[in-house]
Amino acid sequence: MLQDIAETAGQDEETKLQVINTFFNRRVLYRDDWETWGVADYWASPLETLSKGQGDCEDYAIGKYFSLIAAGIPSVKMRMVYVRAQVGGVIQAHMVLAYYPQPNAEPLILDNLVTDIRPASRRPDLVPVFSFNAEGLWQGVSGSSAGDPSARLSRWRDVFAKAKAEGWW
C-alpha cells in the first residue's frame, strides 16, 4: 500500500483517487463484521483491514479516506457518507467516500459496490443520510452542519485515533 501511495507523488488528485480506489477494491474482499471480527459493527483502521484482507463497506471507505490523506489530499475535500443503497431490489445501509474537487462541486463517489468513480448524479442507487470527516458532521452531503463528528460518532473517534497511531498522517 505504501508503495502505491508513494507512486502517486506528483500526480494529480484524480490519479490519486483512481490508484487508491482500485487498490482497495481489488485487495480487500467484502466480508461483514460478523465474519471478520465476530461482532455486529466494527470500524477497522486501514492497517487492520489490509492485514485481514477483508472488510465491509465502512472499512473500504475508511481505508480510502486515510490513504488519500497520506497521498496528500486534504481531508476537507473528502467525506464519509452514510447512505441508503439500493442493491438489487433491497435497500440497505451502506458507506461510501465522497471527494469534492471544489467546496461546492458535485462530489465523486468512491465505492466498493461500483468499482469506477462516478459523480454523485450518476449514482441514483444511493440516498445520502449524513456525511462526516475530520472537520464536521452534516445532514446528507450538503445539508446543515450537525456538529462535531468525534463527539457524535464514537466509532469514527476510535478509528481516527487508531489511524493516527498507525501513522497515516
Label each residue range with its predicted role:
Residues M1-W169:
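A structural boundary/capping signal
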